[in-house]
């Protein structure tokens, strides 16, 4: 699998296919989203919200939760607000989350 990924990436870079994804580091919609890392949401969440590349900072973890007020999720949100101009934060869960019912 790694060889396939590396080969695809090589061709992607050589053909400059990345150019159509160019965006500022500052989110166009001044939006940050905290959501679950569930693979079903990879394309679904931005599509369901009408978001395009560069519109929002999307932070993902298991369950889309802030477990530690001094952890990496909170740090990412603080940087988004204080450095990257984010004005709106959405916390979005989903049905059938695998984290539901797990003990930490």
Cite the ranges covered by each PLM segment:
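Short HxH-centered metal-ligating active-site micro-motif
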Residues: 53-104
């Amino acid at each position: 699998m790694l060889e396939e990924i590396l080969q695809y990436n090589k061709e992607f870079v050589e053909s400059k296919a990345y150019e159509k994804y160019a965006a500022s580091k500052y989110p166009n919609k001044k939006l940050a989203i905290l959501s679950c890392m569930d693979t079903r949401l990879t394309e679904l969440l931005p599509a369901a919200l009408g978001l395009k590349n560069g519109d929002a900072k999307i932070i993902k973890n298991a369950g889309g939760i802030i477990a530690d007020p001094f952890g990496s999720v909170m740090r990412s949100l603080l940087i988004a607000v204080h450095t990257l101009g984010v004005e709106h934060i959405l916390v979005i869960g989903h049905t059938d989350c695998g984290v539901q019912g797990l003990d930490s």
